[in-house]
Amino acid sequence: PVVETGSALFANFPKDHELHQGHSFAPFKDEADLAIVIRTRAPWYPPSNGPSKAVVAVIDESPHRDNMAYQSLQADLYLEGNVAQTLRDLADAVVRMGVDETAVQKRRARLSQSHDRIRQTRLEEQSEARHKTPIDPVWLCAALGKGMPDNTIYIDEVTSHTPLLRQHIDWNRPQSLFTRQGGLGQGLGLSLGIKLAKRDQPVVTLIGDGGFLYNP
């Protein structure tokens, strides 16, 4: 199963993939035997709320960030290096070791059903929000996702509604989501830069009033 945090900074995994299990690690916290944490500063909070029995492995170019005053990953293993290459190497190693294909197919079928349930719940939330006044952020995000083409790039600086944006706008391609790094006010500049780099793709910026006012 692949779980994205509610505050993911980029588009990490296609949301229409059957192994995408939403944005909460809680359902897997006590049953997982291995948790691979990829480029995540705080995968669960508080730090004591991590998996009860899993081995925790962190993969990151810089797992211990000097710019953070406090960071408590409490991992059992740190794999420092290029993330994409590390994942490829791990996948190759698993293939060489061999896996129980029957068990894999059973687990995949179970996760596919879970993926469908999560999606159905999301659709029900969107339907419920559709006729609310003023416009509900859930419906706004859903309408954007339905109305924009598949190659749209979204820029997020909404802050307080970031988790809703992650859940209700569908993106399935790499580089479909970017977020401002640092303080408020960088969203519009980031959007203009991305549009210059991706002239043939629509770029949609979602920005809160605070971020808009702070924009230089």
Model feature map: region roles:
Residues V2-T5, V37-I38, L79-G81, Y154-V158, ...:
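General beta-strand structural signal in soluble alpha/beta enzymes
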Residues S112-D200:
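Active-site diphosphate/adenylate-binding microenvironment
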Residues P63, S160, F212:
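Short, glycine/acidic-enriched loop or turn micro-motifs at the edges of active sites
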Residues A8-H17, E31, R122-R130, Q175-R180, ...:
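Short, basic, glycine/proline-bearing loop/turn elements
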Residues F28-R39, D200-Y214:
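A short, small-residue-rich loop immediately preceding and capping a beta-strand
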Residues P43-P47, Q186-G189, F212-P216:
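Short glycine/serine/threonine-rich phosphate/pyrophosphate-binding segments
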Residues E4-S114:
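Glycine-rich, acidic loop regions that bind phosphate or pyrophosphate groups
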